[in-house]
Amino acid sequence: VASLIANNGKNKTADWAKGFVSNMARKPKGNDRAQILAIAAGEADYAVANTYYIALMLSGKKGAEQQAAAKKVMPFFPNQQDRGAHMNISGAGMLKHAPNKDNAVKLIEFLLTKQAQEHIVNNTFEYPMIDGVSPNPLVPGVDLSFKQDLKTSVKSYGAKQADAIEVMKLAGWK
């Protein structure tokens, strides 16, 4: 929602949020996989879920029922004709006064190696952080023309967080 505010303004995002909430098939409950299961069961036509959960379910690691459910859903990526879809980010950092700076740098450097990234994408189903490593083929969107939002500054998410919470509360988002 903070990303939407950064791109569309608070008022337009508030209108969108009211429409979004009014179209919810049920009160929000459960995690991402619960949303995917609800769609597969016909309880809703759409839900918001991270793609790595669909891939996890497709992998069979969460059982045959979840694998079958994931096969019934189709991902949709918004804003593909515009700025691209919002993506959650993962990051690594080091505290200014970290007692083991050299080891912290080594860890971050290791996490950005091809070996580590391949392990990450094949076990968490997240998108890779470096060129030369492909997403796991189970990740939805790999075979689609997917456009990531590279326009919106991550800094804006924090700057718009309070506004996002206010917009969601006013819309009745629980």
Predicted segments with their positions:
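Ligand-binding pocket segment of bilobal, Venus flytrap-like solute-binding proteins
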Residues: 2-78
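Structured segments of extracytoplasmic/periplasmic soluble domains
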Residues: 7, 23, 38, 42, ...
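Soluble non-cytosolic domains of exported or imported proteins
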Residues: 11, 30-33, 48, 97-102, ...
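Solvent-exposed, polar/charged alpha-helical surfaces in well-ordered, non-transmembrane soluble domains
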Residues: 18, 37, 41, 102-109, ...
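Solvent-exposed loop/turn segments at secondary-structure junctions
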Residues: 52-55, 80-83, 99, 114-117
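Flexible, solvent-exposed loop/hinge segments that line or gate ligand/substrate-binding clefts
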Residues: 68-99
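Mature extracytoplasmic/periplasmic domains
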Residues: 90-149
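Extracellular/periplasmic bilobal clamshell ligand-binding domains
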Residues: 135-174
